[in-house]
Amino acid sequence: MTEEGYPLEAIILVTTKLGELWKVAEEAKKIEGVQFAKPVAGRFDVVVHAKTNRLSWVIARIHSIKGVANTESLITLEAKFE
């Protein structure tokens, strides 16, 4: 569980259809649990940061946005050093 009380924190990398990255980023920001969604340059078109206990639901909502082609999710890990 993260410090804020959410079970999962993830980075979701989104590939969009041509010309859709700005719209996809704006729509992704509206999803509950999304901390930010920003267009990026590189292999992916949008990076989404989410803190949620319903990651599958967040990913499904992202996929429901018109213009989304694919996603790849990275679950953050917490390392504890003593």
Residue spans for each PLM region:
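A compositional/biophysical signature of low hydrophobicity enriched in polar/charged and small residues
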Residues: M1-E82
